[in-house]
Amino acid sequence: MKITDIRIHVLKSPLAEPFAFSQGWVRWRSATLVEVLTDDGLAGWGEAFAQGLEPPEIAAAAIEHALKPLLLGADPRHIEVLWHRMYHATRDYGRKGSVVAALSAVDIALWDLTGKAANAPIHQLLGGAFRARVQPYATGFYRTRGQSEAARLADEALRHHEAGFRLMKVKLGYGVDDDIKCMAAIHRAIEGRGVTLMIDTNHAYGRAEALRLGRAL
């Protein structure tokens, strides 16, 4: 089996209601999809991570101009070899961000192809499943104004609880004082309901602010 072509599909859609997290406002939902084609008719699909701030065209360009030339004619089942080929070829300029996301998209597509070729689920190819069930968590708690949204976030926590979630990840990073107020409101709303809370500031704080927030929580 040989890779004959790699196609990139960029998806973008404006949001009716933009929202914010600590690094900025998200006004679009976007994705960079990659389709790896082979000479025996199989195709594998992968997706590059996009949080909503980076243009999906960056990962698309990395796949088209940096990664695709390294892969054409290769056996897609040689996943580890191809991963190192892509990583080492781009390590001087692509060890994080959209270039690594592009590499990840191709890697996912290669695993998808390999699973199809073997007619087996990927977890079997990776050595088996440790469990058949996982506990999901609700993420969200994004902002629509920025600060001073504690009451709305507490209501959101109650909705997640009513939907059956017992783990929740709260987006913070809007100022330590505001974060503390929001977490206090959320805690009061779900206290005694068997909910575990997690937080994610998306690298908003330095050491001093992170310690202050952690100690307060």
Model-identified regions with their sequence ranges:
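Structured beta-strand/loop patches that form or line metal/cofactor-binding pockets in enzymes
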Residues: M1-G52
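Metal-dependent enolase-superfamily TIM-barrel catalytic cores that perform enediolate-based chemistry
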Residues: G127-L217
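N-terminal amphipathic alpha-helix/helix-capping segment at the start of soluble metabolic enzymes
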Residues: M1-D5, H9-V10, K116, A120-A132
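Alpha-helical scaffold segments in soluble metabolic enzymes
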Residues: A66, R85, A105-I108, D112-L113, ...
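Structured loop/turn residues at beta-strand edges in well-structured enzyme cores
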Residues: M1, S104, A163
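Metal- or metallocofactor-binding catalytic centers and their adjacent structured scaffolds
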Residues: L37-A117
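Conserved active-site and cofactor/substrate-binding residues in soluble primary-metabolism enzymes
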Residues: W28-A31, I58, A62, R77, ...
